[in-house]
């Protein structure tokens, strides 16, 4: 994605922003899930919620973005969108 501004903007617009505006812990849940090796149980412990809550939130991520964090290739896209979105947010501030 180096040098591809359109791809970066698309990830921010279609993936990162919808997750942020959902404001029900989706970014936090997705970030924890990805950083904890895609473990539902570890994510639940980290966030002090039930594993079913993590499952529900990850389904909401799929519903909002069209990308399923339970599938490795799609999880990579989501992880990239989180990184690009955070960089874009910090660049604006």
At which residue positions do the language-model features occur?
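Cytosolic nucleotide-utilizing catalytic cores of signal-transduction proteins
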Residues: 1-93
């Amino acid at each position: 994605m180096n040098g591809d501004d359109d791809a970066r903007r698309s990830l921010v617009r279609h993936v990162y922003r919808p997750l942020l505006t959902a404001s029900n812990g989706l970014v936090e849940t997705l970030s924890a899930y990805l950083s904890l090796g895609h473990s539902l149980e570890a994510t639940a412990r980290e966030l002090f919620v039930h594993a079913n809550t993590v499952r529900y939130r990850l389904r909401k991520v799929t519903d909002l973005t069209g990308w399923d964090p339970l599938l490795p290739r799609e999880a990579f896209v989501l992880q990239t969108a989180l990184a690009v979105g955070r960089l874009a947010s910090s660049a604006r501030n």
